[in-house]
UniProtKB/Swiss-Prot annotation:
E.C. code: 4.1.99.22
Cofactors (names): [4Fe-4S] cluster
Domain spans labelled Radical SAM core: 1-229
Protein name, entry field: GTP 3',8-cyclase
Organism field: Trichormus variabilis (strain ATCC 29413 / PCC 7937) (Anabaena variabilis)
Coiled-coil region list: none
Length: 328
């Protein structure tokens, strides 16, 4: 069994984008009230006194959009400064990144993933649900700022949506040739948006790899991180290409993570809502730290039984939360 030592922490469920695959435009979202969010103190208590003692050493900050969280730089610094923290990273849409990229780096953040689903501003704005002023340039500025500051690896996440951005695969892959950037193609996963995307299906990673192989060739490669991507490289390129194939190539048997939602629910599996723990309510009602640790230890022990091991389009309507509410 894989050691589960990686926790994805959603700092906030709100986002300044409304990406089609994450927060479908037709969906009704009930945002978490501020008083229902884990406070900074509660979050740090859980990290330091519950998660680290049971073996978690790697942490990724997500959202919603994590940069919308007040005092996010201070929170990064607090987690990064814990001696047991072996790796701290963040996934962001990049829109608010440029002005604070250096501050985040100075606080101890070293790895960052930025969503970039299109190089075409019009398509990009369509995907993110932008109405009015284009947001592409500000995201691109955030990527450039992260590059200048020295985040390494700097990963760009691309969710491949059939008929929307799948014609840009080669252009996006080419970003890795001259810069040490790492472009990761993610198979579209219909969670909480089955009605919107049910007829579109998804493009498999093997198809994407073949497109790139036919153009430049591909070799096996590696990049620092603990994610599920299969990593390749265009011969002679400075960066790498990752393929996350959660729909076509089940990787549940090598899952090493759990997810903590912004309102304190610990979720052992992205695709299975069984076994979630409401840590915030337990913490606020006076349950001892020892008891919380034991609950998490038990969840770790049964995680292999909970892991979702199928891929069936019939499950798309079975999720009570969208990607933005889960934390991706």
């Amino acid at each position: 069994m894989n050691q589960v030592d990686y926790l994805r922490i959603s700092l906030i469920d709100r986002c300044n984008f409304r990406c089609q695959y994450c927060m479908p435009e037709g969906s009704e979202l009930d945002y978490i009230l501020k008083q229902q969010l884990l406070t900074d103190e509660e979050l740090l208590t859980l990290v330091q006194e519950v998660f680290i003692p049971v073996g978690f050493r790697q942490f990724r900050l997500t959202g919603g959009e994590p940069l919308l969280r007040p005092r996010v730089v201070d929170l990064v610094g607090a987690i990064a400064s814990l001696p047991q923290t072996q790796d701290l990273s963040m996934t962001t849409n990049g829109f608010l990144l440029a002005p604070i990229a250096q501050n985040l780096y100075d606080a101890g953040l070293r790895r960052i993933n930025i969503s970039l689903d299109s190089l075409d501003p019009h398509i990009f704005d369509q995907i993110i649900g932008s109405h009015g002023r284009s947001r592409w340039q500000q995201v691109w500025d955030g990527i450039q700022a992260a590059h200048r500051v020295g985040f390494d690896p700097l990963k760009l996440n691309v969710v491949v949506i059939p008929g929307v951005n799948d014609h840009e695969i080669l252009d996006l892959a080419a970003l890795t040739i001259d810069k040490q950037w790492h472009v990761r193609f993610i198979e579209f996963m219909p969670i909480g948006n089955g009605e919107l995307f049910g007829d579109r299906g998804w493009v498999s990673s093997s198809q994407l790899r073949q497109q790139i192989r036919d153009r430049w060739g591909l070799t096996d490669a590696q990049v620092r991180g603990s994610g599920p991507a299969d990593v390749f490289q265009i011969p002679g390129a400075k960066g790498t290409l990752g393929f996350i194939s959660q729909m076509s190539e089940c990787f549940c048997d090598r899952c090493n993570r759990m997810r903590l939602s912004a309102d304190g629910w610990l979720r052992p599996c992205l695709l299975n809502e069984t076994g979630q723990l409401d840590l915030k309510t337990s913490l606020r009602s006076g349950v001892s730290i020892h008891q919380l640790r034991e609950q998490v230890r038990h969840l770790l022990a049964i995680k292999p039984e909970i892991n979702y091991k199928g891929r069936d389009s019939g499950t798309t309507g079975a999720y009570s939360r969208t990607m933005s509410q889960i934390g991706g």
